[in-house]
Amino acid sequence: MTTRTATSTSTTVHGHLGDLKLRNAAITGPHLQPKAAKQDLADTKPDSARTFPGLGFKLSPTEERLRAKRNWGFLETAYDNSKVMGLTTHFVTITMAIVFNKSWLAKPVYDWLNTYDRFTIHTVHTWILLSTCQLLVIGLFALTDLSGRPSWLARYRMQPHKPPTLAQYKKLIPVVLFNLVVVNTISNIIYYPLAEWRGIQTTYETLPSGKKLVAQWLVCLLMEDIGFYTVHRALHHPRIYKYIHKKHHEFSAPIAGASTYAHPLEHYFSNLVPILVGLLITRAHISVQYLFFTGLMIGSHVQHSGYNIPFLTCALVHDWHHYFNTENYGPVGLLDAIFKTNKTFKAWTSETVAAFHGDRAKARQAALEKLAQIEAEEQERIR
């Protein structure tokens, strides 16, 4: 197989062909990638002044220069949120869980929960909690997307020139509801006997300590990254992609509801199974199960929202994946770092952030050096 290497960056070409060439350059390495969808390639065509939607604010000179070359990530404020800042959501939800478990409310709540049989706890109650959380998050983003309010949020969009539409929401609702009602229910039913086999506890008396809860959460997060990365990258194989994962990539500029806009098999094996594996390995208490599920549910929808809002889950990484249809396969980024499936993304963002700091020449040189290093590594691998 002939390997294509990254030999250029978007700063060396004119117009939106910069996006296209960088997208092609990103499709490298020993893994095969599908051809970009037609609607993705169409995104590289420059918008005329007449068709370009009003953003409600003026672009800075640097943003205008980037906008002239790129269709993704040309707003400076979209980079205000970092992956470290994005951990705030997890910190808050974990803290709330620990505080609640130590509060006077915990015993009556868990005692009430256990008035139901264990099948109901693991299936019905879990489904109600996750469904409520998912629909609430989708609903909040839908109100923002369709009303345009609060208007300041538009400043945090990675692709502000492609505002969400009512037609998109109408398109995804049937698929999202099917996965929510049918696939999630089947998943809970399959999970129940496995949870019984592993002896997963649900009572107040068996609540984990704060340290144990955090430790189990971290193991679950690691298993989620390993499982999701593996399945997701496999789904990008061209022999599989068009049958399953292509559906999810119909949204090159994703919206929150697109998180579970996926083929049922993908939703189960990619979105759900990696989470369940971690819970089973750690024999996590039902409280950890609820915490982990809801935290990931919020994070996944924020990652697909199109907004990189400070102190919410960082959405830059996954929004890049949807636009360029390559790299950034994992939700955490650990395996992407190990297998270097984030190298073009890192070169791009390093160049862009440097440009916003006023040193465009240095930014361009840094990007060229990074891509030259990538090319050298690929040539060495071929030898």
From Swiss-Prot:
EC code: 1.-.-.-
Any single Gene Ontology cellular-component annotation: endoplasmic reticulum membrane
Disulfide bond entries: none
Protein family according to the UniProt entry: Belongs to the sterol desaturase family.
Compartmental location: Membrane
Matching Pfam families: FA_hydroxylase
Pathways involved: Secondary metabolite biosynthesis
Reported function: Fatty acid hydroxylase; part of the gene cluster that mediates the biosynthesis of the glycolipid biosurfactant ustilagic acid (UA). UA is a secreted cellobiose glycolipid that is toxic for many microorganisms and confers biocontrol activity to U.maydis. UA consists of 15,16-dihydroxypalmitic or 2,15,16-trihydroxypalmitic acid, which is O-glycosidically linked to cellobiose at its terminal hydroxyl group. In addition, the cellobiose moiety is acetylated and acylated with a short-chain hydroxy fatty acid.
Membrane topology: Multi-pass membrane protein
One GO BP annotation of this record: ergosterol biosynthetic process
GO molecular function: C-4 methylsterol oxidase activity; iron ion binding
InterPro entries: Fatty_acid_hydroxylase, Sterol_Desaturase_Related
Expression triggers: Expression is strongly induced under conditions of nitrogen starvation. Expression is positively regulated by the cluster-specific transcription factor rua1 that recognizes and binds to the specific 5'-T/G-G/T-C-G-C-A-T-A/T-C/T-C/T-G/A-3' upstream activating sequence found in all promoters of the UA biosynthesis genes.
Fatty acid hydroxylase domain residues: 217-341
Phenotype seen when the gene is deleted: Leads to the production of UA derivatives that lack the alpha-hydroxyl group.
Known glycosylation sites: 342
Protein name, entry field: Fatty acid hydroxylase ahd1
Transmembrane segments: 84-104, 123-143, 172-192, 214-236
Origin species: Mycosarcoma maydis
Keywords: Glycoprotein, Membrane, Oxidoreductase, Transmembrane, Transmembrane helix
